[in-house]
Amino acid sequence: MIIPWQGLAPDTLDNLIESFVLREGTDYGEHERSLEQKVADVKRQLQSGEAVLVWSELHETVNIMPKKQFRE
Protein backbone atom coordinates (compact mmCIF):
# COMPACT_ATOMS: atom_id res chain seq x y z
CA MET A 1 0.00 0.00 0.00
CA ILE A 2 1.37 3.43 -0.95
CA ILE A 3 1.64 5.87 1.94
CA PRO A 4 1.18 9.53 0.95
CA TRP A 5 4.48 11.01 2.10
CA GLN A 6 2.91 14.48 2.17
CA GLY A 7 0.82 13.42 5.20
CA LEU A 8 3.84 12.61 7.35
CA ALA A 9 5.45 15.04 9.76
CA PRO A 10 8.68 16.38 8.22
CA ASP A 11 10.85 14.81 10.94
CA THR A 12 9.15 11.44 10.47
CA LEU A 13 9.69 11.57 6.72
CA ASP A 14 13.35 12.53 7.17
CA ASN A 15 13.87 9.67 9.63
CA LEU A 16 12.24 7.15 7.26
CA ILE A 17 14.37 8.34 4.35
CA GLU A 18 17.54 8.31 6.46
CA SER A 19 16.79 4.77 7.64
CA PHE A 20 16.21 3.70 4.03
CA VAL A 21 19.46 5.28 2.82
CA LEU A 22 21.50 3.67 5.60
CA ARG A 23 19.87 0.29 4.98
CA GLU A 24 20.39 0.37 1.21
CA GLY A 25 24.15 0.96 1.15
CA THR A 26 23.87 2.04 -2.47
CA ASP A 27 27.07 2.67 -4.43
CA TYR A 28 27.10 6.24 -5.73
CA GLY A 29 30.09 5.83 -8.02
CA GLU A 30 33.47 7.49 -7.80
CA HIS A 31 32.37 10.35 -5.56
CA GLU A 32 31.16 9.54 -2.06
CA ARG A 33 28.02 11.44 -1.12
CA SER A 34 27.10 12.63 2.35
CA LEU A 35 24.09 11.25 4.18
CA GLU A 36 22.39 14.63 3.77
CA GLN A 37 22.90 14.52 -0.01
CA LYS A 38 21.51 10.99 -0.23
CA VAL A 39 18.47 11.94 1.87
CA ALA A 40 17.88 15.00 -0.33
CA ASP A 41 18.07 12.82 -3.47
CA VAL A 42 15.48 10.36 -2.14
CA LYS A 43 13.23 13.21 -0.98
CA ARG A 44 13.43 14.75 -4.46
CA GLN A 45 12.44 11.40 -6.00
CA LEU A 46 9.42 11.18 -3.68
CA GLN A 47 8.41 14.77 -4.49
CA SER A 48 8.69 14.19 -8.24
CA GLY A 49 6.72 10.94 -8.07
CA GLU A 50 9.65 8.79 -9.26
CA ALA A 51 9.65 6.94 -5.92
CA VAL A 52 6.88 5.94 -3.52
CA LEU A 53 6.69 5.21 0.19
CA VAL A 54 5.22 1.74 0.65
CA TRP A 55 3.80 -0.11 3.67
CA SER A 56 4.08 -3.91 3.58
CA GLU A 57 1.29 -5.48 5.61
CA LEU A 58 2.99 -8.87 5.28
CA HIS A 59 6.31 -7.71 6.75
CA GLU A 60 4.94 -4.72 8.70
CA THR A 61 7.67 -2.51 7.27
CA VAL A 62 7.97 0.74 5.36
CA ASN A 63 10.08 0.87 2.22
CA ILE A 64 10.87 3.32 -0.57
CA MET A 65 10.89 2.04 -4.12
CA PRO A 66 10.71 3.27 -7.71
CA LYS A 67 7.06 3.87 -8.61
CA LYS A 68 7.33 1.74 -11.75
CA GLN A 69 8.35 -1.28 -9.62
CA PHE A 70 5.41 -0.99 -7.21
CA ARG A 71 2.64 -3.55 -7.55
CA GLU A 72 -0.30 -3.72 -5.16
From Swiss-Prot:
Cited InterPro entries: UPF0270, YehU-like_sf
Coiled coil: none
SUPFAM superfamilies in the cross-refs: YehU-like
Top-level taxon: Bacteria
Family under the similarity heading: Belongs to the UPF0270 family.
Protein name: UPF0270 protein YheU
Species of origin: Salmonella typhimurium (strain LT2 / SGSC1412 / ATCC 700720)
